[in-house]
Regions:
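Non-catalytic cap/lid and distal C-terminal segments of serine-dependent acyl enzymes
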Residues: 1-126
Length: 126
């Protein structure tokens, strides 16, 4: 966080930014470990705790999820599994290819709002 402008941007836009650590959970509830319920922690416990401790706008239209690398995977996984919770999702350097692999993501492969910034930077004139 200290090497980015996230805090300044969040402050200017009156946003709450939460960065949870999900270990090597793949953002999934462990079947045999009741204390390792990562999906529930992020989709149930965390929003409840935020609403309890901060004055926030209610409703999915005010909630998004985002992540970098493995966190990007978790963000898209949870957003697709819980579309009632999130109105937007951001994936930065996430381990996925929305144009070829996942049928649930393929519907956005031709969406003009989806931009592959890595390809754009690599081939800006194409």
């Amino acid at each position: 966080m200290e090497r980015s402008n996230v805090v300044d941007l969040a402050s200017a836009e009156h946003l709450i930014v939460v960065i949870p650590e999900a270990d090597n959970s793949y953002y999934t509830n462990a079947q045999h470990l009741p204390h390792a319920r990562w999906e529930d922690a992020i989709t149930i416990d965390l929003p409840r705790d935020i609403a309890t401790n901060f004055c926030i706008r209610q409703g999915r239209e005010h909630v998004g999820i985002s992540g970098i690398s493995m966190g990007g995977y978790g963000a898209i996984k949870l957003a697709l599994k819980h579309p009632d919770l999130y109105s937007f999702v951001g994936v930065m350097s996430g381990p996925l290819d929305i144009t070829r692999r996942s049928p649930s993501l393929r519907r956005w492969s031709d969406d003009e709002n989806v931009v592959d910034l890595w390809l754009f930077r690599k081939h800006p004139t194409e």
